[in-house]
Amino acid sequence: MSNKPSHPKNFVYPENTAGSKAAMSHAPRVKPVKKPAKRKILKAKKNNYLKFTDVPRSFREKIGYELADYSVALGYAEDAKATKFEIFGSGVLVRKGNRFGVLTAHHCVHKLRLGSFDSDTLFLVLKRCHRVVLPPIILVKHALAIPKANKEPDLAFIEILPSPQLGSIRAIASFWPLDETHFNISKGFVGIEKPFTVIGFPGAYHQTNIEGNTTHKIIKHTAFFYAIGQDSIRERDGWDYIEANNRYGGKNELPKSFEGVSGGPVWGLQISRDETNGELSLKTFSLIGIAFLQIRISKQELRVRAHFIKSIYDLAWRSLG
């Protein structure tokens, strides 16, 4: 395999999509818009930050496009050439100290055999349709948190050892650093009505088209937007969690299931508005969680549970020293 991945013919990189508590909208595959769409006059908020409900759909799509830099779809292949493969989950590129790899949910990768020549072949789908096949010999699977009977906690880190493949990924995408303290991250992104987004590749949107000997996989990089509520954050046995509530009904286009989003990143957002021209900008953002569980409350309500800040910046890594 070439050290520099090319655009594979059998992959169509997903459109960036955006969602909210009650709805999700699909965006065409275009570059981020430079100007926000027409909208009502936005009132100034305390600290000049805006709630996600004040943010136009076009700008939410732009945020999803920007955060795609860190997103990966996880794929499994039966052979080293990855001619037959399946997409089975989501993840995010991270760096912890001198380690580079993919942070995801443990249940997504617990059956993968890695570390030797006769192990399984893993591949990553990066932004703009780049696909990187990772030979098992350059991968180390770290079980950061093995789920118990209640399906918690649930974290794993697939370390990518120094290799041409790691170099290729670093040239294309970005690795989020996890060396900041969880206290500092919490200061800027924890609070009632603070916006956040859950990102992944829902299986409900996967399509497989076979034309002769060629298999086309179509997947969608999807962003769902929320605001932190009174009961969104909780802690059990030292692990902290955040939940995103999805309500069905009306004209929303939420997927019936969030299967495939497991392992995907949760990002905290700070969105500001220029007082002079009203233009919106993503002031800053931070990785604040990893999604791992969907909970069906009723026909009209489904919750997505994710590990939160302390878990992914501190607690999960203690076993690695």
Regions found by a protein language model. Give the residues of each.
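Protease-domain processing segments flanking chymotrypsin-fold serine proteases, especially trypsin-like
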Residues: 2-90, 95-96
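Catalytic histidine site
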Residues: 53-56, 62-164, 223, 265, ...
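Internal, conserved structured core segments that host functional sites
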Residues: 152-180, 192-200
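A structural micro-motif recognizing beta-strand termini
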Residues: 159-165, 187-191, 244-257
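Short glycine/Trp-rich loop-beta-loop segment that forms part of the substrate-binding cleft
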Residues: 176-223
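A mid-sequence, solvent-exposed acidic-amphipathic segment
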Residues: 204-254, 259
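C-terminal cap/linker of serine protease catalytic domains
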Residues: 251, 281-321
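Catalytic nucleophile loop of clan PA
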Residues: 251-285
